[in-house]
Each structure stands twice: as C-alpha cells, then as structure tokens.
C-alpha cells in the first residue's frame, strides 16, 4: 500500500501533510518517528494530518505530530499550510475553514494571494493554564525567575494552544538557543515540557524571534511562538496593541495582531515543495520493525 503525501513549509518551518480523509493509515509512534527522520524517511519539523470532522460545526480535524512521535496541541505555521492543502486537494472550496485541534477550534481564512490568516484564540497567562508550576520560583509582576542549572533566568509564560516560555534578549543572534532552550524545555516546572522563545524588541511594531520547539529543537519559524511573544510584548507594554506587529524569524516574517480580550490573529505565507508516496510497511521493514497487520 502506498500513501500519498505533500511537503510544505511556512517560512521554512517544514511539514509533511497527509490526507486521511480519502486515505487510510494507522499512524503509530514508530511510523511517525521513521517518517520524521531526514535520512531514513521523509523528514519534517511536524507531521500534519487532515481527518474528517468529529463534530458537525467544523470542517476537518487537524492533528499534529512532532518528529519524536508525540502528538501536540497546536501549530500556527502548520495551520496555514493545512488551509492551503485542503484547498489544493479539493477537499474543500471554502475560503474560511473551521478546524478542530487538540486544543480547540480555530478559524483559517485564505486570501487570493495564498496568504492565510489564522484566528489563534485568546492567549492564556495563568500558570495552571500553561501548565507551569512555579513553586519556589521568584515572580516579579508578570516575569518569573527560573533556576536553570544554577543560573536565574527571567522569562514570561503564555499558552497559545500549546505552552510557551519567552525570554527577552538584547540580540537574538547572541542567544544560546540550543543549550538554554533545551534546558528550559524539559525543566521540571513545565510538566508537559515547553516551547522556548527568545525575543528581541526592534521597535513597537517589530520583533526578532528564535524558537526552540518542544520535541523538535530550533526551527526556522514558529507561528504559535510568534503569537505568544507578541502577546507577552503587548501585555508588558513593549509592543502596540491592536496593530500589525512584524515577527521576523530565520525563515521570514509573519504579521501578528492582538487586542487584549480578543483572539490573536496571525497572517503569513505558505509554500508547496513537492508531492510523493511512501510505503508504511516498507519503511517499517527497513527499520526492522514488524508492520501492523491492519495497516
């Protein structure tokens, strides 16, 4: 059995997208890990899966998997690619879609130039909503001082459908994203692990950002990370509320807008890279894993 897939990216944040509306596949953790291997499989930052809706008021179910095989709640860049994919596959002809994720329902709107606006919902800042357990951690206003390998690190937290910690830095190019990001991602204060953003404020409508993604590592771009960083920046008075804020990442720029009390709106481009097919049984056999007899 061969399964069709599409490779896409949003600002360099790359995805493998599979239509499970018209195809059938048992996505085991082993298979996701193999598909995510850039040497032995296809390779991606996240695997996006389109499934039939589970409720009558949405168009599709949207599932997201990291390369380590874990299923995650949300992916903003992936949401934009999801919208373009279902239109290209003629699974829907709507310009505006409602899709269900593990963290709730989001709305996706595509313009005639192929840019997609995503209603990311309202940000959450309470520790219990991240989740974040700041026991014995110093808090000054909205900032937390977290002990990371004996060094205090000041950070802010937000949930944009998935958990984020954001550190304000003077220059993102000098930030120790790999070491510090990895240490904070798996810090005991974050029981479900956390995505870690490093934000530099350029002016009140422009930030530069690098993100160490949970279960992945640093990526070229992170949509939910940009939303979390801008929301925190607005909450702290560093950025203009209700205005377009440019979030500049390695892979390019997206536009984030947030008025406190309302949803965060994210707008950005998408790109198709190539299409292909793979054999689930073939991949599993090459890796020495017994295929699922029902796949």
UniProtKB/Swiss-Prot annotation:
Molecular function (Gene Ontology), one example: diaminopimelate epimerase activity
Subcellular location: Cytoplasm
GO CC, any one term: cytosol
Site (Important for dimerization): 274
Positions annotated to bind substrate: 13, 46, 66, 76-77, 162, 195, 213-214, 223-224
SUPFAM superfamilies, per the entry: Diaminopimelate epimerase-like (SSF54506)
Pathway where it operates: Amino-acid biosynthesis; L-lysine biosynthesis via DAP pathway; DL-2,6-diaminopimelate from LL-2,6-diaminopimelate: step 1/1
Catalytic activity: (2S,6S)-2,6-diaminopimelate = meso-2,6-diaminopimelate
UniProt-annotated catalytic positions: 75, 222
Site (Could be important to modulate the pK values of the two catalytic cysteine residues): 164, 213
Gene3D superfamilies listed in its UniProt record: Diaminopimelate Epimerase, Chain A, domain 1
InterPro entries in the cross-refs: DAP_epimerase_AS, DAP_epimerase_DapF
A Pfam family per the record: DAP_epimerase
Protein purpose: Catalyzes the stereoinversion of LL-2,6-diaminopimelate (L,L-DAP) to meso-diaminopimelate (meso-DAP), a precursor of L-lysine and an essential component of the bacterial peptidoglycan.
Subunit structure and binding partners: Homodimer.
Similarity field: Belongs to the diaminopimelate epimerase family.
Name of the protein in its database record: Diaminopimelate epimerase
């Amino acid at each position: 059995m061969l399964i069709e897939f599409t490779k896409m990216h949003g600002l360099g944040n790359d995805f493998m997208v599979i239509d499970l509306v018209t195809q059938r596949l048992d996505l085991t953790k082993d298979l996701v890990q193999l598909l995510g291997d850039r040497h032995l499989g296809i390779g991606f930052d996240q695997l996006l899966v389109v499934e039939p809706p589970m409720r009558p008021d949405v168009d599709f179910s949207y599932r997201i998997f990291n390369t380590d095989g874990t299923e995650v709640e949300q992916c903003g860049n992936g949401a934009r690619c999801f919208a373009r994919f279902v239109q290209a596959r003629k699974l829907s002809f709507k310009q505006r879609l409602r899709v269900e994720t593990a963290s709730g329902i989001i709305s996706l709107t595509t313009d005639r130039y192929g840019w997609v606006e995503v209603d990311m919902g309202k940000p959450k800042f309470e520790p219990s909503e991240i989740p974040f357990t700041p026991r014995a951690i110093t808090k000054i206003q909205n900032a937390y001082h977290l002990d990371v390998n004996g060094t205090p690190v000041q950070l802010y937290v937000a949930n944009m459908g998935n958990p984020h910690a954001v550190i304000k830095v003077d220059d993102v190019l000098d930030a120790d994203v790999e070491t510090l990001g990895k240490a904070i991602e798996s810090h005991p204060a974050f029981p479900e692990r956390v995505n870690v953003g490093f934000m530099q404020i350029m002016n009140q409508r422009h930030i530069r950002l690098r993100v160490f993604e949970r279960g992945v590592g640093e990526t070229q771009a992170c949509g939910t990370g940009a939303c979390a960083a801008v929301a925190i920046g607005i909450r702290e008075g560093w950025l203009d509320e209700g205005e377009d804020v440019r979030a500049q990442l390695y892979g390019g720029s997206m536009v984030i807008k947030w008025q406190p009390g309302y949803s965060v709106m994210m707008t950005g481009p998408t790109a198709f890279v190539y299409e292909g097919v793979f054999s689930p049984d073939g991949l599993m056999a090459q890796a020495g894993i017994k295929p699922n007899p029902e796949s």
